[in-house]
UniProtKB/Swiss-Prot annotation:
Stretches the record annotates as G4 motif: 266-273
Binding-site residues for GTP, renumbered to this chain: 41-48, 176-182, 201-205, 270-273, 327
Organism per entry: Homarus americanus
Annotated Mg(2+) binding sites: S48, T182
The organism's taxonomic lineage, starting at the top: Eukaryota, Metazoa, Ecdysozoa, Arthropoda, Crustacea
G3 motif, as annotated region: 197-206
UniProt keyword Hydrolase, yes or no: no
Keywords attached to this entry: GTP-binding, Lipoprotein, Magnesium, Metal-binding, Myristate, Nucleotide-binding, Palmitate, Transducer
Lipidated residue numbers (N-myristoyl glycine): G2
Protein name from the UniProt record: Guanine nucleotide-binding protein G(i) subunit alpha
All copies of domain G-alpha, residue ranges: 33-355
Amino acid sequence: MGCAMSNAADKEAAERSKKIDKDLRLAGERAAREVKLLLLGAGESGKSTIVKQMKIIHETGYSREECEQYRPVVYSNTIQSLMAIIRAMGQLKIDFRDSSRADDARHFFTLASAADEGELTPELANIMKRLWNESGVQHCRNRSREYQLNDTAAYYLNALDRIARPGYIPTQQDVLRTRVKTTGIVETNFSFKNLNFKLFDVGGQRSERKKWIHCFEGVTAIIFVVALSGYDLVLAEDEEMNRMIESMKLFDSICNNKWFVETSIILFLNKKDLFEQKITKSPLTICFPEYQGSNVYEDSANYIRMKFENLNKRKDQKEIYTHFTCATDTNNIQFVFDAVTDVIIKNNLKDCGLF
């Protein structure tokens, strides 16, 4: 009898042990399929645009209702951009070539101040169109490196006819280009190639960086985003600091941080489209006085790539995976993210001893 009870207890213990092993195996498989990505970079590098692309590429994109919710943001971004240009005309002592536009400018500020936030009335839109087409305004816009202006200014102001129409609903591209400062941490979840991604977008302005630290533990990879086009610009929060130099300092502190010895670093050199337009007019020596190459896209972009990759102090142990990106180009981001995922899968297999 005692023997039978002992056998039953042993059998029960064995079943329990088997279940625990199975649960542990399943938990391990789930953990292996979970990928935590930390999206880092200085302010206005394009991180939030990449998050929006993940929604478009790996989820269902933005519904009609969601796009409608972005209409006030589009209007606000457009109005604020034109305000920034006209204010800069005063600072840079640029006159309106057509003197009647000075009255339009005063009227524009009055109407914009009185309008509800995110509203664009027909009267306001017509004044904005006249101002935007004025040659003094265009001259000031071409000198935008001398003041703070959103990258999307020309995109929206060139589209005034379309966005001012009654019943306007922002397109996916309009939504991608909206600019709202990220504060705190935004988490996005999606699945791709049998992996479950958690993407953390962290505020890039200096005042936000202290909030990053508790995201660090257990991160699979860091995607560090740099605005290539920032090489001739200064920070919004510190007009003595060049944006590219600030990005390099931040990258150095992340890449060589003791917490990230085992963490894959993926470098997105972003806004390559704006950089390509800018580099022929604004030399790279503004940021890197020692640069002796030509001011063409390929040479200049590769020089910046080398400057960042050379900051890696553990080249023998750690590889930087660099990609040139345009965050507003869905096809480009889809292609690059596919390559990034393959690197993550390969590194996961290496960690498991299967590669």
